[in-house]
Amino acid sequence: MKAILKSLVIILVSTPIIHADEYTGREKSETCLGCHAIEGYNNTYPTYKVPKLGGQHSDYIISALKAYQKGERKHGTMHANASGLSDQDMIDIANYFESIE
């Protein structure tokens, strides 16, 4: 029994954990929520529908943020918002949005 417990402790201690703190994700998402949490919100100049991000898969959100950051997706506001985000910021934000509806 001691050997099993010892093995589990070694595995847990040596396994890297990528963790997204819900509070941190919400805090980092405050700017995003202004547009992406409003049902049926339309942006102006040009007019287009802003997607609601609650419940969206985190991998998709991270991919989109990286594309805006690199200029592969075109939108001035999104490029400006994404350009200052670290990889950990993107993980925290994406995991927060995935966790809400």
Where do the PLM segments sit?
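Gly/Gly-Pro-rich "capping" loops immediately C-terminal to redox-active cysteine motifs
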Residues: 37-67, 79-81
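Sec/Tat signal peptide C-region and signal peptidase I cleavage site
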Residues: 16-22
